[in-house]
Amino acid sequence: MMSSRILRNVGLLGLSVLLLAGCSSLRVFFPSKTYETIAPEVPAALSKPAVLLFSKTNGFRHDEAIPAANALLTELAQERGWSVFATENGAIFNPVDLARFDVVVWNNTSGDTLNAAQKKDWQTWLSAGGGAIAIHGAGGDPSYDWDWHPESFIRAQFTMHTMGPQFQDGTAVVENADHPATRDLPERWTHHEEWYSFAESPRDKDVDVLVRVDESTYAPTFSLFWMDTDIAMGDHPVVWSHCEGGGRVFFSALGHQAAAYQTPEMVALLGGALDWAADPSLADCEDKGAE
């Protein structure tokens, strides 16, 4: 059961969305329950590694970020000689189709995107040694119908994001420069973002924190009309990786705006994330899957 703090924050966030964005954002509180049952046709020839870009939204939709992220990830994969297939059809989460991919990217997905059978097949594929990348909105729902998603896949429960202003410059700080996703990043850089806050830091949930945001460099508040809520976390990771069974999961809370995917830092971050997610030898997840 969600805490009273999370419930209050959900209410504040939803009210702000409705006030600022109007009826088009009603799906935040009245999400769609659309589930596909007929899988899309995947090309017969997929060079390896193969990347699946999944961007279905049954809740809030990042209209600009989704195509921008898909474009960058496609370019990065093709530069490596990999194949890419993009879809918003949840029926692709079946054993036959998933077996054809090495990496699955959840690109700003939202809401409950899979039915019960698809969820089971996705968890089985991942824990058996698959590689996954989750971007921004994929970990940005205030509540889920599927506890496994925030608790095991993302390993953090989103509460609120900055508001007043919504988008701010903040200093991102690399904590682990040895990870493929961070090895080409500067130690610190200024990033313009809608900064997510979580119910608690994932640091003690068996994750490798790669990047945190320095909360002294921006205003971690939700301020709108009469509402003024402190959403500081103190310890505030924004990028991390972990093992889920024998599989690899990389999560980045960065990437609300399309412009973010044109910055050299995001190019380096997501390029390295692809390398890591596609190569089991770059993580120590195989042994954990056997435990």
Predicted regions and their residues:
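Short, solvent-exposed loop/turn segments at secondary-structure junctions
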Residues: 58-59, 92, 111, 139-140, ...
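Extracellular ligand-binding/catalytic regions of CAZymes and related secreted enzymes
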Residues: 25-46, 72-75, 79-82, 88, ...
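C-terminal motif of bacterial Sec signal peptides marking the signal peptidase cleavage site
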Residues: 21-22
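Helical hinge/lid and interdomain linker segments adjacent to catalytic or ligand-binding clefts
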Residues: 5, 53, 59-142
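A glycine-rich, often tryptophan-bearing local segment used as a flexible ligand/cofactor-contacting loop or short
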Residues: 112-187
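Bacterial N-terminal signal peptides that target proteins for export
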Residues: 2-11
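Catalytic beta-strand/loop cores that center a nucleophilic Ser/Cys/Thr
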Residues: 31, 35-36, 160-245
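Nucleotide donor/acceptor-binding cores
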Residues: 49
